[in-house]
């Protein structure tokens, strides 16, 4: 139903012959809605890759209405998979912007987390795989993962004993596909050329196109009613004046003579007609069957003509106020289908998660003071502290110098080490 309302209309479609010339096919479909923004799209080309994120149906309708009224509007992505999104750097979908999308993670109890919504572009399998990889690398500690997904997403994450659920949630966002960053790039074909536009610009072009298509539809409908009105007026005069019973008509020697007689009889009424009477009109009058003539009712004919004139006046009013007509059309669309498209993705501002604070201490740091090496593989040497593979190490030497260096399997730092430990960034309490 939506496609019939919005996408398909043979009367406003530009057609061309198919490859074999036997059928017609559309050059483009006359779409009266920003489907590109509603569905999103992704494509690749050398230097012209495109990634347009999907948006909410109701918000697109509201934005189109606001634009037509000359009011401001803002559009932000909305995903069927739900989750939450940080649009601080969305940049109206233009190249160079970025959004962060997170899964929805709930605490069922102190030992179990439930992922019920996943980020856009991910599947339950890819999310689970990313969690298991993070476990293998020692980034997070969990006991097992269960996939109970059916009609709705449900991934259960069972925590290891003694593991903080809050810290694990942050770690899932930091090290797995529970949080992803997406870089939109609104590259579209406009006027047969690629252009990098904003989402707002695309919506404005769509709204203008919708207005033009609705105007075309009104003009086509008006033309059809005018044709019906023209023939109804001809038919009424032809039957009421009993032109079909004229002696000259009945005794016409050929079709041309009959047409000439009808044309002559209609001549006094020409000023009342909408357009010039053609031979095709006269031939159509001659095709009226006797049964229709016998059942003809003048009052009903007058009612029909009056009704068609009212419809034409109404269409003329719509054409004179085409912006208001387009606004009402978008409002009709929203009222008819909007309840089926609630917003699924929550708009939020995400706090930055520092990986070093949520990663599990999955390694042990050692030092060989005599040879000047530190690392996680020097298990026979002096133990320093537990650490993770993304931590930094701070080292002070006896001459007063110090260095900060990443944790490594084995690294030469120098002899005469006075102090060594895991370096905590933004630690304002420790004095060296």
Predicted regions and their residues:
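Short, surface-exposed recognition loops or helix-turn segments adjacent to catalytic cores
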Residues: 14-22
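C-terminal interaction appendages of subunits in large macromolecular complexes
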Residues: 2-6, 10-11, 15, 29, ...
């Amino acid at each position: 139903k939506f496609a019939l309302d919005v996408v398909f209309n043979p009367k406003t479609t530009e057609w061309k012959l198919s490859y074999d010339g036997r059928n017609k096919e559309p050059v483009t479909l006359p779409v009266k809605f920003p489907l590109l923004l509603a569905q999103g799209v992704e494509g690749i080309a050398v230097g012209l890759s495109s990634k347009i994120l999907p948006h909410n149906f109701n918000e697109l309708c509201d934005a189109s209405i606001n634009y037509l009224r000359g009011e401001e509007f803002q559009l932000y992505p909305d995903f069927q998979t739900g989750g939450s999104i940080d649009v601080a750097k969305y940049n109206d979908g233009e190249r160079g912007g970025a959004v962060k999308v997170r899964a929805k993670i709930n605490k069922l109890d102190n030992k179990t987390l439930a992922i019920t919504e996943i980020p856009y572009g991910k599947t339950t399998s890819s999310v689970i795989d990313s969690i298991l990889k993070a476990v293998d690398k020692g980034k997070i500690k969990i006991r097992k993962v269960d996939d109970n997904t059916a009609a709705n997403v449900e991934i259960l994450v069972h925590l290891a004993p003694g593991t903080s659920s809050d810290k694990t949630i942050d770690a899932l966002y930091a090290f797995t596909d529970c949080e992803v960053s997406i870089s939109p790039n609104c590259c579209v074909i406009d006027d047969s050329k690629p252009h990098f536009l904003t989402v707002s610009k695309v919506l404005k072009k769509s709204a203008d196109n919708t207005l033009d298509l609705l105007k075309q539809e009104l003009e086509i409908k008006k033309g059809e009613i005018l044709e019906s009105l023209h023939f109804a007026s001809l038919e009424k005069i032809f039957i009421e004046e009993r032109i079909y019973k004229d002696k000259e008509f009945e005794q016409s020697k050929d079709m041309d003579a009959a047409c000439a007689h009808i044309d002559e009889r209609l001549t006094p009424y020409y000023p009342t007609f909408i357009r010039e009477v053609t031979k095709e009109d006269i031939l159509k009058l001659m095709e009226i069957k006797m049964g229709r003539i016998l059942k003809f009712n003048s009052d009903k004919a007058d009612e029909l003509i009056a009704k068609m004139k009212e419809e034409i006046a109404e269409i003329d009013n719509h054409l004179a106020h085409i912006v208001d007509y387009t606004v009402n059309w978008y409002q009709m669309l929203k009222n008819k289908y909007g309840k089926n498209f609630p917003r699924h993705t929550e708009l939020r501002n995400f706090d930055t998660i520092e990986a070093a604070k949520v990663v599990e201490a999955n390694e042990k740091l050692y030092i060989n003071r005599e040879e000047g090496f530190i690392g996680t593989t020097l298990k026979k040497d002096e133990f320093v502290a537990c650490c993770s593979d993304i931590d930094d190490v701070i080292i002070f030497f006896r001459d007063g110098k110090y260095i900060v260096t990443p944790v490594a399997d084995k690294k030469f730092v120098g002899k005469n080490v006075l102090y060594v430990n895991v370096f905590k960034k933004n630690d304002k309490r420790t004095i060296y």
